[in-house]
Amino acid sequence: MADRTEQILTPSQLNTLARDLLEGSFPLVWVEAELGNVTRPASGHLYFTLKDARAQIRCAMFKPKSTWLKFQPREGLRVLARGRLTLYEARGDYQLVLDHMEEAGEGALRRAFEELRARLAAEGVFDAERKQPLPAHVRRLAVITSPSGAAVRDVLSVLARRFPLLEVDILPSLVQGDSAAAQITSLLQRADASGRYDVILITRGGGSLEDLWAFNDERLARAIAAAHTPVVSAVGHETDVSLSDFAADVRAPTPSVAAELLVPDQRELVARVRRAQARLSQLQQHTLGQAMQHADRLALRLRARSPQARPQLLQRRQEDAARHLRARMQHILERLQARVQRAQAGVQSHSPQRHLAPLQQRLRAAHPQAAMQRRLQQDHLHLRGLVRSLEAVSPLATVARGYAIVTRQADGSVVRSAAELTQGDRLRAQLADGSVTVVVDTSETG
């Protein structure tokens, strides 16, 4: 009894153990079956059963996931569902909580799509090195699409608004069904071979994977990759991806975006042209201004060399020479004045001030240049007389009369008395015509 008591569980405990066992054993499963008992309450969640001929399982797909379904779930529809097994503990219901669901036919198509994409990628069909850039200016555009679909209306509307001058050819084609891929491929090859177009756009609106299957055709993908003309693919909505998108030189998420990629906005072009015109005008004005300045310089040079300008040139040269001569004379006078001032300073150191005062007065009184020159000559003669007077009392004149100036040979000091000398002193005697060196033998005073 004790052993049995330890194994007794409550319903909630048992359901919890069962839930953990289910979720641990089946983390994620794929199920292909028919829909039944489809309900969608106000909460937005989706509840139904997946069934076959012998069994069924309760399923739930909550609103965040069910909102993205690309089809309307209905009774009897065969689907491929992915989810995790769990158990609703409150009722003990075993169920499958789904995060993805598609129509059963799409499951096979998607597997075929992935296999073909991997094979073409391995062959290098989708390599980025093979892709061509779009031309800067598209003049002629070929659009391969359904002539009655929403895609062609969107493309033409955007092109007309942004760049109405673009030449557009609509190449009508089926975009859905068994023969659509072959027709699109044929139109692409003919448009590429014509050499008429700058870009070829392949486009259609959104749809299911089966609706878009023509754009997953291997021959079409290879034709796009082999085209010499740049190809833009805009198939379905932004979440739809086809092999034509991988093979194309440029992939656009929607037809409208493709049209915007292909042509500039005419308003932006007008603004760019106006800015270019403004820069060109500025450049022209600058260039013209430089040319006019150069022409003015040449005209001045020509006028300077013309016969009419010769007298004026000579007159200017004469005036320049006169100014230079006056400046030169002024410089000479200033130098003479400086010499007189230096001579005055020398005379002041040897004679009374009265000898120079009259000279200074005469210099200050001499304003005209001619009078100044005559006065300078007179003063020069007077200075020569003063110099002769000074020379008469100069020590050199005394030496010339037979005397000598005796200095010590060691330091050059003048010997003024015999008492300053001792036996052996070496002396230098400066005579009128030279000097002699003597050695003191004896000295006598008195």
Curated annotation (Swiss-Prot):
Family, per entry: Belongs to the XseA family.
Subcellular location as annotated: Cytoplasm
Organism: Xanthomonas campestris pv. campestris (strain B100)
Job of this protein: Bidirectionally degrades single-stranded DNA into large acid-insoluble oligonucleotides, which are then degraded further into small acid-soluble oligonucleotides.
Reaction(s) catalysed by this chain's protein: Exonucleolytic cleavage in either 5'- to 3'- or 3'- to 5'-direction to yield nucleoside 5'-phosphates
GO molecular function, one term: exodeoxyribonuclease VII activity
Stated name of the protein: Exodeoxyribonuclease 7 large subunit
Pfam families linked to this entry: Exonuc_VII_L (PF02601), tRNA_anti_2 (PF13742)
Entry EC no(s): 3.1.11.6
Subunit structure: Heterooligomer composed of large and small subunits.
InterPro entries associated with the record: Exonuc_VII_L, Exonuc_VII_lsu_C, OB-fold_nuc-bd_dom
Keywords: Cytoplasm, Exonuclease, Hydrolase, Nuclease
One GO process term, biological-process aspect: DNA catabolic process
Gene Ontology CC: one annotated term: exodeoxyribonuclease VII complex
